[in-house]
Every structure is written in C-alpha cells, then in structure tokens.
A protein has these predicted regions:
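PAPS-dependent sulfotransferase catalytic core
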Residues: 1-77, 81, 92-97, 102, ...
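The conserved 3'-phosphoadenosine-5'-phosphosulfate
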Residues: 159-262, 266, 280, 285-291
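PAPS-dependent sulfotransferase catalytic domain
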Residues: 52-66, 121-202
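Surface-exposed cleft-lining segments at the edges of enzyme active sites
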Residues: 46, 77-78, 137-150, 255-260
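Generic recognition of short, well-ordered alpha-helical segments
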Residues: 17, 85-88, 183-184
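Alpha-helical packing segments of well-folded alpha/beta enzyme cores
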Residues: 60-63, 86, 154-158, 185, ...
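Non-transmembrane alpha-helical segments in soluble domains
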Residues: 19-23, 61, 91, 111, ...
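Generic structural signal for small/hydrophobic residues in well-ordered secondary structure
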Residues: 14-15, 60, 74, 90, ...
Length: 291
C-alpha cells in the first residue's frame, strides 16, 4: 500500500501526538518510523544528520508494506511544512493525498523548538542568540531545516500546499483547540480521512517538557549510534515509552522572558494578521490580540 495522507507539521505543534492517536484506530496505518523525512531530502545539506532520514524510494515504500487494504495509510514529518520542495514532491508521487496541518501560537512554537534544538545538538546558545542567528539565515534567504523561526511563517507554507492540493484535501488544525478537546479533533481528522467509526482511547500527557534523568542518560541520548540503533530497531511509540520510563523525566520548562516574547511578537505580528485573513478565522493566540 502507498501512503494517502501526510501529517506535515508545523513542528512542535502536536504532530507526533496526533499520529499516535490516529494509529490507535484499526482503519488507520501510520509508519512506525516517525519523521522519515523522505520528501524533504532535497532540502538538506551534507552537514545535516538525522538517523531516521530515508532517501531511497523503495525503502520509503517499505514503511507501509504492513498496511492493509482499505486502511488510511500515512506518515508524519513536520519538516515537510516549511520545506520548499515537499508539497510538490508529494503531489508528484501521490497526487490524491490528503494533508493534515497543525498550527500553534508561533511564539510558543519557536520557544519549544529552541529546546528541542538544544537537546539534539548539545547547543548552549541562549534563546535570544538563536533568534539572532536564525533571523540572519532568513534575511540571507538561507534555508536551514532546523531554523526555529521559519516554520512559524504559516501563511506562505500553507499557500504552498494549497497550490499543490485542492482545498478539500487539506485539513488545518489549531493546536490550542486540539489541546482543549483532543477527542473532538481526532474525530474530525478521522472524518476527513473518510473514517466514520469511533474509537475510545486514553489521552496521554501532551508535549510535556522532558530532560535526561541523569548524566548517563544524557550521554546515551546524545550518542548518534545509540539513537540510530534505537530508531531502526524499536517502533516510535515503544521508543517513547522506554524513553519516558528509563531515560527522561518531566520537569517545568524555563519561562520565556517578556523581552523575548515581545521580540517574537514583533516578528510574527503581521504574519498572524495575514493568516487570519487566509483562514477567515480569529486565532486564539492572545499575544496578538492585546489592545
């Protein structure tokens, strides 16, 4: 079976969580490998390292070989959303696909992305320093797959998918609405995928901030061979459960400074206004509605 739907992002907006719940339904099959990156392979440089990235077409299709007839078949890669190439590449190979997009307050999304970047790259830059660097990349028209700001310019990325897929093939979710009513949102996505049988599922903690439990855990999680082996051998859901039990602990995320918040507000203010016009809705992001 070939994939017929894609959860494309935005990053740090619940895509992994959404794919987890969808995969609970017997009429849905989602690749066990989370974020295969296949359709963003043209975006990456020689210096890009991602253990789960697949560049071979046959290997990519093998991700879906266990799918059954009449199942909705999909995968989730948040890098597709801001990729200059992914939308058109998906359309070329799978033109009848459905696209699922989740949008989060871009200020909170960028801050969450910063912590992921720190963890993955052992980076000690402050949030403000990273904003400086990534703003410079955008100003110089440099596409960098790990840029923490670029995915938050939602309008242009949505338009890229709208240019490649019909309106009824694109489902847009507001992350904050999803968090407030997981059941309703998942049911609406299932309906979008033409699945009308309901399923009961247990709501997990959503996007909790986690850090390594100790120095040993950090060393293992920073080891590329360890991560690569785990990615190849252990399905995503099982890997997350093992990580939560043995390697990670939940803690309170350090607060964003008011200065940093105001800076991001200025970066995204006109973008949010444009997005509300495009979607014809009032977005629930209070940072942008204070008079």
């Amino acid at each position: 079976m070939n994939p017929n739907f894609f959860i494309v992002g935005a990053s740090k907006s619940g895509t992994t969580n959404i794919s987890y719940y969808l995969n609970e339904h017997p009429d849905v099959f989602i690749s066990e490998l989370n974020e295969p990156y296949y359709f963003s392979r043209l975006d990456v440089s020689k210096n890009f390292k991602r253990e789960s990235m697949i560049t071979d077409y046959e290997k990519y299709l093998s991700l879906f070989k266990k799918a059954k007839k009449n199942q909705a078949v999909g995968e989730a890669t948040s890098a597709y959303f801001s990729s200059p190439h992914a939308a058109s590449e998906i359309r070329k190979m799978f033109p009848d696909s459905k696209i699922i997009i989740s949008l989060r307050n871009p200020i909170e999304r960028a801050y969450s992305s910063y912590f992921s970047y720190q963890f993955m790259h052992k980076n000690d830059q402050s949030f403000s320093e990273m904003i400086d660097l990534h703003q410079k990349q955008i100003s110089n028209d440099e596409f960098y797959i790990y840029n923490i700001l670029e995915p938050g310019f939602y309008t242009k990325h949505i338009k890229r998918f709208q240019e490649n897929f019909a309106k009824d093939k694109i489902k847009i979710i507001i992350f904050e609405d999803y968090i407030n009513n997981v059941f309703f949102t998942i049911e609406s996505i299932l309906s979008f995928l033409d699945i009308h049988t309901k399923i009961n599922f247990h709501v997990q903690s959503k996007g909790a901030y986690r850090v390594p439990k100790n120095k040993v855990s950090r060393k293992l999680l920073e080891n590329s061979f360890f991560r690569q082996t785990a990615t190849k051998l252990i399905p995503t859901v099982s890997r997350q459960k093992i990580g939560d039990k043995f390697f990670l602990k939940q803690t309170k995320k350090p607060p964003m400074s008011q200065q940093e918040r105001e800076r991001l507000k200025k970066i995204y203010e006109s973008e949010v206004s444009e997005l509300e016009v495009l979607l014809d809705i009032k977005l629930p992001w209070s940072d942008f509605h204070v008079k």
